[in-house]
C-alpha cells in the first residue's frame, strides 16, 4: 500500500509528534508499505510566532498537490493542523479522497494559556478540520474522551506502544519475604 503522511512538525524539532511519525513510517515500511512523508523541509517557511523552532510552510498547496498527484497514495494521513495539514485537507476534500488525521497535543489549552483564545473557538476550528476525516487518531484514552466531550464523533485510539529496542524489562525476581522482613 502507498501511504502519504503530511506533517507540519518535523526536524529539527525534537518532540513526540516527530518521534511518532518517524517510528510509524519505519514500522509501516518494515511491513512492506511504501511510505512518503511531506514535511516543511520541502517548502519555504517562516518561524512560528512565539515558537521559532516550528517552521510554518508558506503557500504549500501547489507543491503539495504535485507530490500527491505524483505519488497517488492509497492512504493519506494528515498529522497536523498547520499550513501543510490545511493544504492536504483541501486537496483530499476537492478530490473526495478519504483521509485520516491525528490529534497529538493539547493545542487549544496551549493557545488559551499563551494568547487567551477561548477553548471553544479553537475546538470549533479543530472540529471543522478533523470532522471530514475518516478518523481522528488520539494517543490516549484520556485525550480521546476529551475530544469526544468537545464534540468530536470520529475519534479512535492510536496508542504508541513500547520500543523494545530501548525498553527491555528485566526478569522479575521472587521476593525473599523472610529476608525482606529483617529490613522492616
Can you name each region flagged by the protein language model?
Residues 41, 142, 161:
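Carbohydrate-associated surface elements
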Residues 64-85, 95-100:
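Short N-terminal targeting/anchoring amphipathic segment
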Residues 162-176:
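Acidic anion/phosphate-binding donor-loop and adjacent secondary structure
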Amino acid at each position: 500500500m502507498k501511504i502519504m503522511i503530511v506533517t507540519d512538525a518535523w526536524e529539527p524539532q525534537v518532540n513526540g509528534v516527530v518521534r511518532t511519525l518517524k517510528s510509524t513510517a519505519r514500522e509501516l515500511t518494515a511491513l512492506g508499505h511504501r511510505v512518503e512523508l511531506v514535511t516543511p523541509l520541502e517548502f519555504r517557511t517562516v518561524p512560528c510566532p512565539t515558537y521559532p523552532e516550528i517552521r510554518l510552510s508558506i503557500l504549500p498547496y501547489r507543491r503539495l498537490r504535485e507530490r500527491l498527484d505524483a505519488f497517488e497514495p492509497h492512504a493519506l494521513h494528515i498529522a497536523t493542523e498547520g499550513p501543510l495539514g490545511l493544504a492536504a485537507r483541501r486537496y483530499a476534500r476537492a478530490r473526495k479522497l478519504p483521509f485520516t488525521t491525528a490529534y497529538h497535543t493539547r493545542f487549544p489549552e496551549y493557545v488559551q494559556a499563551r494568547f487567551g483564545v477561548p477553548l471553544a473557538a479553537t475546538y470549533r476550528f479543530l472540529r471543522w478540520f478533523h470532522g471530514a476525516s475518516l478518523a481522528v487518531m488520539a494517543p490516549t484514552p484520556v485525550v480521546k474522551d476529551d475530544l469526544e466531550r468537545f464534540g468530536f464523533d470520529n475519534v479512535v485510539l492510536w496508542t504508541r506502544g513500547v520500543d523494545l529496542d530501548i525498553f527491555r524489562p528485566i526478569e522479575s525476581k521472587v521476593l525473599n519475604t523472610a529476608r525482606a522482613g529483617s529490613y522492616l
